[in-house]
């Protein structure tokens, strides 16, 4: 699903292995490609899935290119209106339009199952951008939720997500008890000396700010 095939190679793969590739596989590949802004791949894969998925991906691709319209969203068949990729497209569009509060509420209502999201790390990127905008607006409580409720699966993305949640809790909410578990998860995920030292530093800062000095050890 992550392969960036050229059109001729894609045709060869479909010819040889098409019996093993159904609508679900083509739709998943299309969504993954759209998130990575590989528009040609996304639309070709969508076409293999059928006209309904093509309508869905046209809206998603347009949104990631800042060209989505209400008409494109309305053209998506009813069976796909609640698809996670369309939710992503709507959230992205709201954020780019600087409708940050609406984008945040839509994100909080979005699915969180990594399988449903297709590319949960790309969803984390969108969450991070929204959380930062919320901090600019002084809404640290919602920014914390946006960061803390991530579904990132990549180690680097998980570390960054847990850092953001912990940092917001510590620096903006003044809640070391809420911050400490996120810094602990950073340490659990860390795979390099640098990332581990960063996590332990912030665990120490949370402990220092805790009334009894023990939060980072939990």
What kind of feature is each model-predicted range?
Residues 1-218:
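Alpha-helical solenoid repeat scaffolds
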């Amino acid at each position: 699903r992550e392969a960036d095939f050229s059109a001729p190679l894609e045709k060869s793969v479909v010819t040889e292995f098409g019996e093993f590739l159904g609508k679900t596989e083509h739709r998943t590949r299309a969504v993954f490609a759209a998130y990575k802004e590989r528009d040609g791949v996304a639309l070709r894969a969508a076409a293999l899935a059928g006209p309904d998925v093509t309508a869905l991906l046209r809206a998603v691709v347009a949104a990631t290119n800042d060209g989505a319209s209400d008409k494109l969203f309305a053209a998506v068949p009813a069976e796909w209106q609640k698809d996670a990729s369309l939710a992503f497209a709507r959230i992205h569009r709201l954020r780019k339009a600087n409708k940050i509060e609406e984008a945040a509420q839509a994100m909080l209502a979005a699915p969180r199952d990594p399988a449903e999201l297709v590319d949960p790390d790309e969803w984390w990127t969108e969450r991070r951008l929204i959380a930062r905008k919320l901090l600019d607006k002084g809404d640290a409580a919602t920014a914390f939720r946006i960061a803390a409720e991530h579904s990132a699966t990549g180690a680097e993305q998980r570390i960054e997500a847990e850092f953001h949640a912990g940092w917001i809790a510590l620096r903006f909410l003044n809640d070391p008890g809420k911050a400490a578990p996120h810094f602990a998860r950073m340490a659990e995920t860390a795979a390099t000396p640098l990332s581990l030292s960063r996590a332990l530093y912030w665990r120490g800062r949370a402990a220092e700010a805790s009334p009894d000095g023990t939060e980072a050890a939990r």
